From Swiss-Prot:
The protein's name: Leucine carboxyl methyltransferase 1
Residues holding S-adenosyl-L-methionine: R119, G142, D168, D224, L225, E259
Enzyme class: transferase
EC number: 2.1.1.233
Basic residues: compositionally biased ranges: 44-55
Length: 397
């Protein structure tokens, strides 16, 4: 594959923007495709007006793509994640049909696997340092099928967490709740974190039509953070206060995670989320992961292919690591302003944090010749963080 081809595949596959269809034989006869059957519930009389739906905050494919990239990295040996296969199993494609899930299931190119390793390495270090400083609560925004809770609680010495809350759309929390309830390897960790033995029976309750799962330690919360058009007086901060705050203790040090979420929100909405956490918790930390520098050819490819699917990234105006860090210390946050902030690209994390032994280990897993190409890709993704409170002040990468 050419360098340009590698770059395009990484830009679209790794971030979850769109999948590239498999190559076809130009000399092959065109396959017969039956006429598509109408979807149930979508046949409407011509005179009826179609109800307008709000676009999703992030691409619908970002959930399976994000998890399959992680599964690919774990399969090759970059990561250890025994829970990914329990939380997501892509459906089998129909014979002769192109399905994005089938592409997502395949092993990813080395560029993507290395990027997934560095992303996980950096965020894991920040989360661990938060917990080592007495952090007690974690809120994962747009969690999808993230496995971090289980990776933390399955450690030989699990952290002393008080609450772990995952938030996403109901159509995404529903299958996750079903899989948690189905697998004892998942629900055995839902009890109090101080207990080494799994609690008897099922330590959780399922509600809201199967979209919410709650336990003394863990909550999977179905929630759309966007204000409803039917309630113009509502705001993101009001939604967070009404639905999320009852799950937490504002007196405890709290971390919020937003991985590939804010680009699909307006800068005003993401600022309101950061401000709410800074105002609500006197000791707080935020970690954001997203892309930067999208004004070059790499970013233009991503934006063009998102536009094909009628998706945009209005929150991608923070084009440098410095501007990403500045989101936490902006005067516009007023009382929600964080005390300190920082940011690093994945390339900086590779150069400064991963370490020679780990780099040597992963270099033996796959052949990766184009280091300059890798650098170009990794410099377009950044991990930014902000801290507030005395015990959180020195946390950084």
């Amino acid at each position: 594959m050419t360098q340009c081809g590698d770059r395009r595949l990484f830009a679209l596959n790794y971030h979850g923007a769109i999948q590239t269809p498999p190559p076809t034989d130009p000399n092959a006869a065109p396959a017969h495709r039956p006429a598509p059957r109408p979807a149930l519930g979508r046949c409407r009389p011509p005179h009826r007006r179609r109800r307008r739906l709000r676009p999703p905050v992030r691409p619908p494919l970002s959930l399976p793509v994000a998890l399959t990239t992680r599964s690919s990295a774990a399969q090759v040996g970059y990561l250890q994640d025994p829970f990914a296969s329990l939380l997501y199993r892509p459906p089998m494609p129909q014979p002769g049909a192109f399905a994005p899930q089938a592409v997502g299931r395949a092993r990813k190119p080395p560029l993507i696997n290395v990027g997934t390793h560095h992303r996980t390495w950096g965020i894991d270090r920040l989360v661990d340092r938060f917990l080592q400083r007495g952090g007690k609560q974690v809120v994962s925004l747009g969690a999808g099928s993230d496995t971090r809770f289980w990776r933390l609680m399955s450690r030989a010495t699990p952290p002393d967490l008080a609450r772990y809350v995952e938030i996403d759309f109901p159509h995404l929390t529903s299958p996750k709740a079903q899989r948690i309830a189905r697998h004892r390897k998942l629900y055995q960790y839902l009890g109090p974190s101080s207990t080494a033995m799994p609690p008897p029976g099922h330590p959780y309750t399922v509600s809201k039509g199967g979209t919410q799962l709650s336990s003394p330690l863990y909550t999977l919360l179905p929630l759309d953070l966007r204000p409803s058009p039917s309630e113009p007086a509502s705001s993101i901060s009001a939604i967070l206060s009404h639905h999320v705050l009852p799950q937490l203790d504002p007196r405890l040090p709290t971390l919020f995670l937003a991985e590939c979420l804010f680009p699909y929100m307006s800068p005003e909405d993401s600022r309101e989320i950061i401000k709410w956490f800074g105002e609500t918790f006197c000791s707080c930390m935020g970690v954001v992961y997203e892309m930067v520098g999208l004004d070059d050819s790499f970013g233009n490819v991503m934006k063009r292919n998102l536009a094909v699917r009628n998706l945009s990234i209005p929150g991608s105006i923070f084009s440098t690591p410095e501007s990403q860090a500045g989101r936490f210390t902006s005067p516009m946050l007023q009382g929600g302003k964080f005390d300190s902030a920082g940011a690093k690209t994945l390339w900086q994390i590779r150069e400064e944090d991963v370490g020679p032994e780990e780099l040597q280990r992963i270099s033996k897993l796959e052949i990766l010749d184009e280091i300059e190409e890798l650098r170009l890709v990794l410099e377009h993704y950044v991990i930014a963080w902000g801290t507030k409170g005395e015990c959180m002040s020195s946390i950084s990468l």
